[in-house]
């Protein structure tokens, strides 16, 4: 008789081995059927297209999960250094197609769905965008997660699971109206709630100093409930985790007072605690010092650091060691990247944990903290820098304020010793600003508390070092680095432009997807007329497809053989959508003046959201829609010129418009755009760039040759010289008749006949307080646009320039960026090991990893 199994042997039957599904068309169809009937409880008679989308998403997810579990088991076995990317924004967009591509399932899924008589594209369009970001900063975080997984780094994205993401933009009567983005209303098939890892986060209260140490007591507690989303690498079986925290009230919330009496009200008040993760603040490059926002920033930081320390202890904490010696290994096991200053409170929070809870001496705690953190700066605009009122922090986080004061005191002592007579330097470098309302400068806190600080393009990093944080870089020059941004070629080429991706693969093979520098091989086809024509054909197909989309969704008919001239990004004065608009008015006036003259037809497309409280940005949208109303309905203009405002620009819309673009507008005032990443997406997708020498445009020109971009306007030093001399907008207005005409038309109500003074504030701003000097670059911009039109009339020369740009875009892969972060900042090595899906290690992995 067989010996009975021990409990341990019985447990071994609970295993992922043997249940990881086969990945072929028949199995995918089976999975689809199973999920439609057993997960969604529908049959084909009552299933809606949304049910079919969910059935497909769950089927694809099944193939993710095996890899996800194996990846976490692998990390537990190998115990690699882990990197934690802390960001208040992750602008992920849609997940289905990206997952199919990264798992190598797209063809099989396409075939399975086709065999089931369904339309794959229709199903993909049902998915909601995960719009948990405003623009570039959040989308960068998403691209970085893709690259970290593709490079086999043990990486975790940590953020907030906002119930409402970036608002949906509606245009009514030419004005922006915001609507709530209830992206979770149908459920989210990709996330997994992890209530077993729920953690407490404390607010308010008071600080008590005793002989045993310092305690933060009488606090209000909010619980942080984690939701995990898998992040697959490209064809390497690595699946990392993005963990987003949702706020929950504890069960005894407002009921702790025995005589509270009003039980119903106490339950209703739970909403107040849960509001922390309710909505994303819709500000891009603008600081709004609201208590709820500060709560969000501390909430993500406090929950994340508890999680990081729990995982560190589960993997490496040897109980025979004292906490002090055990934590010596912390920076060897943990790197934390702060995506802008939003998670800056992680620095005092880690100090609080080390000093108050783990009882480390201050100097040891500070040494470990500095070695752990690194900070990425994303903007040089003064209005975007976070400066929290001391009073607000004192009320919400009293212990953290004490720690910040202590950090500042030691920091200033060090500076005073180095520069004994320089009192003004102390003022400039302090973490606390004393003028007016006392404030904490969060960028200064990040710099002092990190071992590395980086800008996001060469020119931006130079400005950071020589202007914005000059004193700090003089003190510690080696702390400051550059890491030029990048984009993931999986989403921004394979997914959004399969025609171009295949064409490239036919010429140079498929390896470029993981090593984008191989695109330089395309230079050997510059003389290949057939290839140039094929590239042009792909662009034409994309334009046709986008024209049909515009007609269907926006009821706008456009000429698909016109030049598609596109500016899509957040609406902000520094991005100068106004300059673009003035050019449209100028083109319109030229056509009206001489209708018989040859004119290269253009469709100008402008899209982007304005922060709800940003009056000038909203007025700019109204101007664009008003100009469009006149231009598009003038029979004399016909199909020569059209202006479209692209409503509700978001990741999934970017995936449609970018591959269809001929001309990419990157026209910020030199020295204002830190990097930009839209510029890179357009370049990779075969658009030519008209732009200033700003942000990553500078490096794009370096890579492709300045003669292969349409560069115009003031350089950084010209802007500085003009500031010194004094910018007089009137001088340009008087000297340039076409500019004068355009401004007069806007001012006198030509584009707003029912309300002639509608744009007076805008015109007034352009004349008297335009920090971004639109008029100063107008003439150069219009002349440069004439060069663009000329080249467009010579398709072969245009296509050669397009190919040169695609071939030069390899530097701008986020894989390259992440390799540089890993090497220079995190001290980590990418791994090209493909994790085996069959084996399984001994237990304990999930205990340590909490996935």
Swiss-Prot record:
Subcellular location: Cytoplasm, Cytosol
Swiss-Prot/TrEMBL catalytic activity: [(1->4)-alpha-D-glucosyl](n) + phosphate = [(1->4)-alpha-D-glucosyl](n-1) + alpha-D-glucose 1-phosphate
Family under the similarity heading: Belongs to the glycogen phosphorylase family.
Sites marked Involved in the association of subunits: 109, 143
UniProt name for this protein: Glycogen phosphorylase, liver form
Subunit architecture: Homodimer; enzymatically active. Interacts with PPP1R3B; recruits the phosphatase PP1 which dephosphorylates and inactivates PYGL/glycogen phosphorylase.
GO biological process, one term: glycogen catabolic process
Hydrolase recorded as keyword: no
MF term (GO), any: glycogen phosphorylase activity
Residues modified as N6-succinyllysine: 364
Coiled coil feature spans: none
Phosphoserine: residues bearing it: 15, 524, 561, 639
Activity regulation, per record: Allosterically regulated through the non-covalent binding of metabolites, being activated by AMP and inhibited by ATP, ADP, and glucose-6-phosphate. The activity is also controlled by post-translational modifications including phosphorylation and acetylation.
Modified residues (N6-(pyridoxal phosphate)lysine): 681
Source organism of the structure: Ovis aries (Sheep)
Alphabetical list of PANTHER family matching this protein: GLYCOGEN PHOSPHORYLASE, GLYCOGEN PHOSPHORYLASE, LIVER FORM
Broad class of enzyme this protein falls into: transferase
Name of the gene encoding the protein in the UniProt record: PYGL
E.C. no: 2.4.1.1
């Amino acid at each position: 008789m067989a010996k009975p199994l021990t409990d341990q042997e019985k447990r071994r039957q609970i295993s992922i081995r043997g249940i990881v599904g086969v990945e072929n068309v028949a199995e995918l169809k089976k999975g689809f059927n199973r999920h439609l009937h057993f997960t969604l409880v529908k049959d084909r008679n009552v299933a809606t297209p949304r049910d079919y989308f969910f059935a497909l998403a769950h089927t694809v997810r099944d193939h993710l999960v095996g890899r996800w579990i194996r990846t976490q088991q692998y990390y537990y076995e190998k115990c690699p250094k882990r990197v934690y990317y802390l960001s208040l924004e992750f602008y992920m967009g849609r997940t289905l197609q990206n997952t199919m591509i990264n798992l190598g399932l797209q063809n099989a899924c396409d075939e399975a769905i086709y065999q089931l008589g369904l339309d794959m594209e229709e199903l993909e369009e049902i998915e909601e965008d995960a719009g948990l970001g405003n623009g570039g900063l959040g989308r960068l975080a998403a691209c970085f997660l893709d690259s970290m997984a593709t490079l086999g780094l043990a990486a975790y994205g940590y953020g907030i699971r906002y119930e409402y993401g970036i608002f949906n933009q509606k245009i009514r009567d030419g004005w922006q109206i915001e609507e709530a983005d209830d992206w979770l209303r149908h459920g989210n098939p990709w996330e997994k709630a992890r209530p077993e890892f729920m953690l407490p986060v404390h607010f308010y209260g008071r600080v008590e100093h005793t002989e045993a140490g310092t305690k933060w007591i009488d606090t209000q507690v909010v619980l942080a409930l984690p939701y995990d989303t898998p992040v697959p690498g490209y064809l390497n079986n690595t699946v990392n985790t993005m963990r987003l925290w949702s706020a929950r009230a504890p069960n005894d919330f407002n009921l702790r007072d025995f005589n509270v009496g009003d039980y119903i009200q106490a339950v209703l008040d739970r909403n107040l605690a849960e509001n922390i993760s309710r909505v994303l603040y819709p500000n891009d490059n603008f600081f709004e010092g609201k208590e709820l926002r500060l709560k969000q920033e501390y909430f993500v930081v406090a929950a994340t650091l508890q999680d990081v320390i729990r995982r560190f202890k589960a993997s490496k904490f040897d109980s025979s060691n004292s906490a002090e010696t055990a934590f010596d290994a912390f920076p060897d096991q943990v790197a934390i990247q702060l995506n802008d200053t939003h998670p800056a409170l992680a620095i005092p929070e880690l100090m609080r944990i080390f000093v108050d809870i783990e009882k480390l001496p201050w100097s040891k705690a500070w040494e470990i903290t500095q070695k752990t953190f690194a900070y990425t700066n994303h903007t040089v605009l003064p209005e975007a820098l976070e400066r929290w009122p001391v009073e607000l922090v004192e009320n919400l986080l009293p212990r953290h304020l004490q720690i910040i004061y202590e950090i500042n005191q030691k920091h200033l002592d060090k500076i005073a010793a180095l520069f004994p007579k320089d009192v003004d330097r102390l003022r400039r470098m302090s973490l606390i600003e004393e003028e007016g309302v006392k404030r904490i400068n969060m960028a200064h806190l990040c710099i002092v508390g990190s071992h590395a600080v980086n800008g996001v393009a060469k020119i931006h990093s130079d400005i950071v070092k020589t202007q914005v944080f000059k004193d700090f870089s003089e003190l510690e020059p080696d702390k400051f680095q550059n890491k030029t941004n990048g984009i993931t070629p999986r989403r921004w080429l394979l997914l959004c432009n399969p025609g171009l991706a295949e064409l490239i693969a036919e010429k140079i093979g498929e390896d470029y997807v993981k090593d984008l520098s191989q695109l330089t091989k395309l230079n050997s086809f510059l003389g290949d007329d057939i290839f140039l024509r094929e590239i042009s054909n792909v662009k034409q197909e994309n334009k046709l497809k986008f024209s049909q989309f515009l007609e269907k969704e926006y009821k706008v008919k456009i000429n698909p053989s016109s030049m598609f001239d596109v500016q899509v990004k957040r609406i902000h004065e520094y991005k100068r959508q106004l300059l673009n608009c003035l050019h449209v008015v100028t083109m319109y006036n030229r056509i009206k003046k001489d209708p018989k003259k040859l004119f290269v037809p253009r469709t100008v497309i402008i899209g982007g959201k304005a922060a709800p409280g940003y009056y000038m940005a909203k007025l700019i949208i109204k101007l664009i829609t008003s100009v469009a109303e006149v231009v598009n309905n003038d029979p004399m203009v016909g199909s020569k010129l059209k202006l479209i405002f692209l409503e509700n620009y978001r990741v999934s819309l970017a995936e449609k418009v970018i591959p269809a673009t001929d001309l990419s507008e990157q026209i910020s005032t030199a020295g204002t755009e830190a990097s930009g990443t839209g510029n890179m997406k357009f370049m990779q997708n075969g658009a030519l760039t008209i732009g200033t020498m700003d942000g990553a445009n500078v490096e794009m020109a370096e890579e492709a040759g300045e003669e292969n971009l349409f560069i115009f306007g003031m350089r950084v030093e010209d802007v500085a010289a003009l500031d010194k001399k004094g910018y007089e907008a009137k001088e340009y207005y008087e000297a340039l008749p076409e500019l004068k005409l355009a401004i007069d038309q806007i001012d006198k109500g030509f584009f707003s006949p029912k309300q002639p003074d509608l744009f007076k504030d805008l015109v007034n701003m352009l004349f008297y307080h335009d920090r971004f000097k639109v008029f100063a670059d107008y003439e150069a911009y219009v002349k440069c646009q004439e060069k663009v039109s000329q080249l467009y009339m010579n398709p072969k020369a245009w296509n050669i320039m397009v190919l040169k740009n695609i071939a030069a875009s390899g530097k701008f892969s986020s894989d390259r960026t992440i390799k540089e972060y890993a090497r220079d900042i995190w001290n980590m090595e990418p791994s090209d090991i493909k994790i085996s899906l069959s084996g399984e290690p001994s237990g304990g992995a999930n205990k340590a990893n909490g996935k």
